Amino acid sequence: MRIGIDAHIVLRKHKRYDPRIARYTEQLITNLLATDKKQEHTWVLFFDERMKSTKKFERPNVEIKRFPFIQYRKYLPMVYSHMLISSFLAAARLDVFHSPEGLIPYLYPGKIVTTFHYVPRGKSESNLFVRTFMLGARVAFAQLCKRARRIIVSSEEDKKLLVDRHGYPAERIVVMGIEEAAQGSWARRVKALIKVYKEVAGSAKKNRKKK
């Protein structure tokens, strides 16, 4: 599989930098790479173009890409920003794209897995969440969520919120300990993630065959 992972949040200069999410993202990537000893997959890592050193992530089966003009995104019209990032992702020809920080580029036609570290509890929080964390998209939170084939959350409470408040299908939600990820048990998480990636990529291939 060609698995893309959004890693731009690890840059401290990023305007939405969160040390907790950055640490989770970095650990996610390093553990996925370490587990893939047979190099069965190609890992496409997307960094902020201001990220100077990516040596710790470099492997024979890793492709390093940098989002263009990411620091100027705030000056771009919202739709153009989405188009730019979505076309950049599409050019990578991924089987699945995982955003560990909850970003969903709503113009991207590929298969998306995303991790929500927070689930809005109501409409006002949903609007703020979309504007702040999801590229400033002016679309309903529930509609944006449907672009993701799987959403990873840290608790059953978050899953219930996604289902009851936002109408996201329960069968597409994966409950996985995010907050305690730093304490270990990454082998179990990596195994679960690879299963999710295969399910999403597999469904994509089946849909292409039907067409």
What residue ranges belong to the model's regions?
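Carbohydrate transferase catalytic cores enriched for Leloir-type hexosyltransferases
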Residues: 1-211
